[in-house]
Design a protein with these regions (language model features):
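Accessory terminal helices/loops
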Residues: 1-109
Length: 109
């Protein structure tokens, strides 16, 4: 158990020091096979992905390294532009229904 916790703490820091963003670290980091197979490290109440983001925020704060985070569009402006780009609200709603029917829950969100 201790080895797993140490790995999940140290590896994000190693990748942060290489300049990776939280999203990049989440995609790159995975437990080694010997830790993944441990019943004591099963992901019930949290995941390595959650932990990576928490560790990043704990050490470096809210800024992810993405310049778009410094002064983002407000949510209404961003939503309208995305809707326009997609061809309007009807197209977005159709995609929402399709994704929901396909159990693509993360995409629906």
């Amino acid at each position: 158990y201790r080895e797993g916790m140490q790995y999940v703490h140290d590896q994000p820091i190693r990748l942060m020091n290489k300049g990776l963003t939280p999203d990049q670290i989440v995609e790159e980091l995975d437990l080694p096979k010997n830790l993944k197979e441990s019943p004591y490290l099963a992901e019930f109440y949290g995941t390595v992905r959650y932990s990576v983001r928490s560790i990043f925020n704990g050490y470096l704060g809210w800024f992810s390294g993405d310049l778009a985070d410094l002064d983002p569009l407000n949510i209404n402006e961003k939503s309208q532009r995305i809707s326009d780009l997609a061809g309007g609200n009807e197209n977005l709603f159709s995609e929402l229904i399709r994704a929901s029917d396909a159990s693509e829950h993360q995409w629906v969100l």
